[in-house]
């Protein structure tokens, strides 16, 4: 049984997220998903949707066997419970695959790291594009 782990913020769910999770699932038999904690997101703007709500939405996907919130202190902590065989990164995730595999090995994990370079091509397959569209349509100062 091959256990796959996918991670992400999953803010403003869109078809690109669905594509990523389906691709991740194709690497194994079980798909676990770590949803980033609001407090750990430092490389981009804070999510619009709170972490608990994002977790519930990801948990509802049929391709996902189990979704969990990430750790608020150590990104490797949840891996002790999950013990993945493969960690799948999306095309836009900032981790370096080689560096991540090295860090995993130093912590006793044997997971292989793969990146899905394909991205679904559609007009609103990006949380950033969705936000831009909302701002264009409704203006920045309106509620």
From Swiss-Prot:
InterPro entries: Archaeal_FAD_synthase (IPR050385), Cyt_trans-like (IPR004821), FAD_synth_RibL (IPR024902), Rossmann-like_a/b/a_fold (IPR014729). Its EC number is 2.7.7.2. It catalyses: FMN + ATP + H(+) = FAD + diphosphate. It holds the Pfam family CTP_transf_like. Keywords: ATP-binding, FAD, Flavoprotein, FMN, Nucleotide-binding, Nucleotidyltransferase, Transferase. Transmembrane segments: none annotated. ATP binds at residues 9-10, 14-17, 92. The keyword ATP-binding applies. Pathway: Cofactor biosynthesis; FAD biosynthesis; FAD from FMN: step 1/1. Its cofactor is a divalent metal cation. One of its GO terms (biological process) is FAD biosynthetic process. One of its GO terms (molecular function) is FMN adenylyltransferase activity. The keyword ATP-binding applies. PANTHER family: FAD SYNTHASE. Belongs to the archaeal FAD synthase family. NCBIfam families: cyt_tran_rel (TIGR00125). HAMAP family: FAD_synth_arch. Homodimer. Catalyzes the transfer of the AMP portion of ATP to flavin mononucleotide (FMN) to produce flavin adenine dinucleotide (FAD) coenzyme. This is FAD synthase. It comes from Methanococcoides burtonii (strain DSM 6242 / NBRC 107633 / OCM 468 / ACE-M).
């Amino acid at each position: 049984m091959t256990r796959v782990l996918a991670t992400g913020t999953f803010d403003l769910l869109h078809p690109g997220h669905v594509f990523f999770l389906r691709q991740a699932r194709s690497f194994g038999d079980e798909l676990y998903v770590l949803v980033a904690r609001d407090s750990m997101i430092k490389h981009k703007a804070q999510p619009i949707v709170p972490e608990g709500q994002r977790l519930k939405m990801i948990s509802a996907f049929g391709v996902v066997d189990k979704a969990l919130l990430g750790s608020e202190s150590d990104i490797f902590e949840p891996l002790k419970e999950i013990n993945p065989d493969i960690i799948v990164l999306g095309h836009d995730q900032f981790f370096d695959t080689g560096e991540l595999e090295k860090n995993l090995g130093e912590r006793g994990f044997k997971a292989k790291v793969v990146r899905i370079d394909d991205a679904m091509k559609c007009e609103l397959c990006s949380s950033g594009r969705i936000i831009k569209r909302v701002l264009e349509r409704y203006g920045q100062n309106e509620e």
